[in-house]
Structure formats: structure tokens, C-alpha cells
Curated annotation (Swiss-Prot):
InterPro entries: YbaB-like_sf (IPR036894), YbaB/EbfC (IPR004401). GO terms for molecular function: DNA binding. This is Nucleoid-associated protein XF_1808. Its main location: cytoplasm. It comes from Xylella fastidiosa (strain 9a5c). GO terms for cellular component: bacterial nucleoid; cytosol.
Length: 107
């Protein structure tokens, strides 16, 4: 009986590892847009939080302080969206198994 449980656990662990790998690959391809100032500034991040592009409306180019604030806000917006996507994708990849507190995915 015990041997069957161990084999089943090993199969689940292998399936979870495959699912995590697939989810990480999907996240690497993902692009998320964060925006601020009613769309005057937008930041595009990859699923690994690599900044791919920053767009700034030309109408605000003379206000450096506003641009700085809006870039930070747009980046944070995109970062939060990546976190949400990551949690959803990694959560489904772990087959519903709960992880210990503070255990962060991807590794």
C-alpha cells in the first residue's frame, strides 16, 4: 500500500514539474501593459518583469517630474499585472497543492 502511494506522489511531482516548466515558458513569452495618467504613459513588461517598452505621450514631454511619476506608476501597474498572471499560471501548474507560506514561484 505504501509503495503505491509513493509511486503516485512521484508521478504527481513529475507532472507538477512539467506544468511548472510550461507555465514558466508561457510567462517568458507574456507581455503585459501597465499605464498611468489616463494612458499618457505606458510600460510593457515581459512575464519575467523585463521592461520591453516605455511610451510617453508627447504632450507631457515638458514636465519631467510628471513623466518620472507616471513612469513609476505605469511600471508598478504592469508589475502587479505580471504578479497576478504569474500566480494564476503557477497556481494551476501546482495541481492545486498549497505551497508553504513565503514559498515563491517561479523559483
Amino acid at each position: 500500500m505504501m509503495r503505491g502511494n509513493i509511486a503516485q506522489l512521484m508521478q504527481q511531482a513529475q507532472k507538477m514539474q512539467e506544468n511548472l516548466q510550461r507555465a514558466q515558458e508561457e510567462l517568458a513569452k507574456l507581455e503585459v501593459t501597465g499605464s498611468a495618467g489616463g494612458g499618457m504613459v505606458s510600460v510593457i513588461l515581459s512575464g519575467t518583469k523585463e521592461c520591453r517598452k516605455v511610451r510617453i505621450d508627447p504632450s507631457i514631454l515638458n514636465d519631467q517630474e510628471m513623466i518620472e511619476d507616471l513612469i513609476a506608476a505605469a511600471f508598478n501597474d504592469a508589475s502587479n499585472k505580471v504578479d497576478t498572471e504569474s500566480k494564476e499560471r503557477m497556481g494551476s501548474a501546482t495541481l492545486g497543492m498549497s505551497l508553504p507560506p513565503g514559498f515563491k514561484l517561479p523559483f
